[in-house]
From Swiss-Prot:
GO function term, MF aspect, one: ribosome binding
Protein's organism: Ruthia magnifica subsp. Calyptogena magnifica
Coiled-coil region list: none
Record protein name field: Translation initiation factor IF-1
Lineage of origin: Bacteria, Pseudomonadati, Pseudomonadota, Gammaproteobacteria, Candidatus Pseudothioglobaceae
Record localization: Cytoplasm
Amino acid sequence: MSKSDYIELEGVVKEKLPNTIFTVELENGHRILAHISGKIRKHYIRILPGDKVTVEMTPYDLTKGRIIFRHK
């Protein structure tokens, strides 16, 4: 899948789960499970409940995603 096939949405982290998985509430009200991307993991960027994030999702599974950016 190319980069353009992914859906990017913004949301707020609601809960931190084990193994760097987070519950994220999207702007449209849906809640998804999201893990952090490799670049965020590599640079030790901390993500806490309440942070605003950008999530990348595949059109095939709209219940899971990847956190690709943490807004300031």
